[in-house]
């Protein structure tokens, strides 16, 4: 045998428009990015998404709920369908819940026990107004967390960030109270825009 053999990179998929960092995460993980499709109104067509997952067999499937930038949320039943579809192709479903506190939908964290291929990422940047601290967290099956521990950067979280997060959690009731006001104002603006056409 002569020459160099190459093999195709694994695939990751996300349904655009969505959070712009997901393709970069795929690139860092050495997987090819594929733009999945949404409807013309930017809502996620779960039936079409399940078909795309079955056809492409992605190693990583990204969804964001509520979606950034559209604000639309995905129901827990739709996420469950995506979890089943990704499990069928031995893939992981990464559910970005950065804006979860602004949604009335049930969290995908409730699916992890039954669907170990579901990973849920969250951040303190949004609801806790903690963007400058750059602190996020992941909820996943223990096996997934153990695997991630093997590749995480050492000293990835400073003592100052940890201390600031502890203080924020002590005041979470006050900080999260602002979320309801923001959500209420958002709904008023959305209703006014809808009325204007």
Predicted regions and their residues:
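PLP-dependent aminotransferase class I/II
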Residues: 117-194
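Structural scaffold positions in well-ordered secondary structure
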Residues: 7, 61, 96-98, 121, ...
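Short beta->alpha connector loops at strand-helix junctions that form conserved
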Residues: 16, 35-40, 97, 122
């Amino acid at each position: 045998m002569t020459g160099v053999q190459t093999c195709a990179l694994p695939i990751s998929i996300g349904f655009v428009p969505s959070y712009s960092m997901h393709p970069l995460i795929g690139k860092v993980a050495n997987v090819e990015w594929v733009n999945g499709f949404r409807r013309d109104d930017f809502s996620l067509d779960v039936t079409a998404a399940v078909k795309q997952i079955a056809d492409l067999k992605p190693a990583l499937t990204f969804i964001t709920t509520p979606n950034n930038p559209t604000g639309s949320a995905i129901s827990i039943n739709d996420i469950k369908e995506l979890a089943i579809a990704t499990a069928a192709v031995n893939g992981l479903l990464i559910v970005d819940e950065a804006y979860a506190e602004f949604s009335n939908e049930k969290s995908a964290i409730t699916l992890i026990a039954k669907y170990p291929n579901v990973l849920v990422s969250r951040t303190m940047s949004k609801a806790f107004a903690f963007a400058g601290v750059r602190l996020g967290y992941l909820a996943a099956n223990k096996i997934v967390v153990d695997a991630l521990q093997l590749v995480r950067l050492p000293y990835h979280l400073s003592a100052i960030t940890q201390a600031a997060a502890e203080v924020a959690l002590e005041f979470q009731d006050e900080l999260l109270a602002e979320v309801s006001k923001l959500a209420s104002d958002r709904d008023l603006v959305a209703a006014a825009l809808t009325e204007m056409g």
